[in-house]
Amino acid sequence: MDEREALIKAGEIARQVKKEVISLIKPGTKLYDIAEFVERRIIELGGKPAFPCNLSINEIAAHYTPYKGDETVLKEGDYLKVDIGVHVDGYIADTALTFRVGMEEDDLVTAAREALENAIKVIRAGIKINEIGKAIEETIRGYGFNPIVNLSGHKIERYKLHAGISIPNIYRPADSYVLKEGDVIAIEPFATTGAGQVIEVPPALIFMYLRDRPVRMAQARRVLMHIKREYNGLPFAYRWLQGFMPEGQLKLALAQLDRVGAIYSYPILREVRGGLVAQFEHTVIVEKEGAYITT
């Protein structure tokens, strides 16, 4: 399987899982059950999770994934963002959508969805990425909402979810990277009723291996070896390690690894004023005259 075939296969799996998860999005469903279903289906369909299933409600924009024992359930009217990552041999599909639990789509959800559609329409080899930001910003503001300025899409490479280039959700002249044929990018507009910025809040439930570092604690060394071997430098969930060792030891090990820079932690991201947030995302391959949507 070559690179393009693997990217397309990962996208097909992500698309299928998005369809299947709809039946679980109803009041009373536990976030834990949704995340476990999504990640299990990815594996059953022949892929692997490229990152933990993110399930972020209302003012939480990103980086919430449930843990074992998490009793959070969906309530009617919740804005649930489901962000799914699949990889096939390291080639990644990253996609997201927003549901209003038990209710019809409203203008906030429509604004984010249309921002994604309009952004994809401008993509082709040779454009500057600020043209994507312009399409997103104009669409979201046209509905009377704010784009989240400190969240962005991203270039993707093999085993690299964020490959150094950010795809903005607003127009900035300085965003002058020119798209090349064959670039793989994730476009992910976030629309909010709030101020249009996110802040980090504890706890971190998602982590990523960065580098080997000497650590005192034997349990920390064990965790480091395990995550390096298992996840190929892609993000992993605290939930995936629950049961690997006693909970208290695991928390201490992760804290030590984070402190010495062996791992990166992803704090939960909340809209600064507590505004509601909607998100949509596709992964696309840049072509000469357009974009091939893999997801």
From Swiss-Prot:
It catalyses: Release of N-terminal amino acids, preferentially methionine, from peptides and arylamides. A divalent metal cation 1 binds at residues 83, 94, 281. Pfam families: Peptidase_M24 (PF00557). Keywords: Aminopeptidase, Hydrolase, Metal-binding, Protease. A divalent metal cation 2 binds at residues 94, 154, 188, 281. It comes from the Archaea. Binds 2 divalent metal cations per subunit. Has a high-affinity and a low affinity metal-binding site. The true nature of the physiological cofactor is under debate. Most likely, methionine aminopeptidases function as mononuclear Fe(2+)-metalloproteases under physiological conditions, and the catalytically relevant metal-binding site has been assigned to the histidine-containing high-affinity site. The enzyme is active with cobalt, nickel, manganese and divalent iron ions. Gene3D superfamilies: Creatinase/methionine aminopeptidase superfamily (3.90.230.10), Winged helix-like DNA-binding domain superfamily/Winged helix DNA-binding domain (1.10.10.10). Coiled coil: none annotated. Optimum pH is 7. Its cofactor is Fe(2+); Co(2+); Ni(2+); Mn(2+). One of its GO terms (cellular component) is cytoplasm. Removes the N-terminal methionine from nascent proteins. The N-terminal methionine is often cleaved when the second residue in the primary sequence is small and uncharged (Met-Ala-, Cys, Gly, Pro, Ser, Thr, or Val). Belongs to the peptidase M24A family. Methionine aminopeptidase archaeal type 2 subfamily. This is Methionine aminopeptidase. It comes from Thermococcus onnurineus (strain NA1).
